[in-house]
Amino acid sequence: MGGQQADGLPALSLLPHLRRARDLADRRYADPLRLDELAAAAGVSKYHFLRAFAAVYGLTPAAYLAQRRIERAQDLLRSSNVTVTEVCMLVGYSSLGSFSSKFRQLVGVTPSEYQAKFADGAPRIPGCYVFMHGLSDRKRDG
């Protein structure tokens, strides 16, 4: 599997395998994912995976995962009454400082400022409902 086309992009035969790894990152974004796990899902070495993923998606796997986590955090901050600290943990960050820094870098405002923008909108989903009904996407059987 593999090789590259003349334009430097990964061979078309590799695309479904990269998609499989990206789907894994999408499903398990809140879990600590390692590069070798994602590369194994694609069936290539981690070094080849890193280059191919970045060439196809325009982001490294780590940057893609961070972006996915922040997108999910935005959803939770907009639509639920879960605290910023709870959102931080739900989307896979173990440090509120790291989460807030990455959120501000990608969104342009702090998580608290972002959440405050939506405070007067439609009624928000209670945090207890988010946790009870698995809306946080976290696996319970882990």
Give the ranges of each region predicted by the language model.
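Alpha-helical bundle regulatory/interaction domains
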Residues: M1-H48, A55, T60, R72-S101, ...
